[in-house]
Amino acid sequence: MKLNDLSPAPGSRREKHRPGRGIGSGLGKTGGRGHKGQTSRSGGTIAPGFEGGQQPLHRRLPKFGFVSLKAMDRAEVRLSELAKVEGDIVTVQTLKDANVINVNVQRVKIMLSGEVTRAVTIGKGIGATKGARSAIEAAGGKFEE
């Protein structure tokens, strides 16, 4: 037996629909599209959100909110995530290399969540909450100013 000899068991798979191939197929002539009208024509699809001429929902509701540009280049890091960084010095670049933060992030702040397992030196440009700072210093770590 070879791979080209293999075929599914008879009746285990349904035949694909072939519209417009005779009355007996059940999809002949109009091909399941019905008679006349926009959707019976080729290219006759209705745009997403179109509601037949009435004011669409996305235009009936008011605009709100915005996307903060600050949120795109800032990130919060938990104490427990510092363990993923190889080496003793934690910088923005080492956090990126360890896939802790996104490559677009420029400013980082460490939050008190989890535990510090080893002494680490936090590089310049990385902020920390009071609780996170005291936890890092209690574990023997320090901050570069």
Curated annotation (Swiss-Prot):
GO terms for molecular function: rRNA binding; structural constituent of ribosome. It comes from the Bacteria. GO terms for biological process: translation. Residues 1-57 are annotated as: Disordered. Keywords: Ribonucleoprotein, Ribosomal protein, RNA-binding, rRNA-binding. Coiled coil: none annotated. Residues 21-31 have a biased composition (Gly residues). One of its GO terms (cellular component) is cytosolic large ribosomal subunit. The keyword rRNA-binding applies. It holds the Pfam family Ribosomal_L27A. SUPFAM superfamilies: Ribosomal proteins L15p and L18e (SSF52080). NCBIfam families: rplO_bact (TIGR01071). Binds to the 23S rRNA. This is Large ribosomal subunit protein uL15.
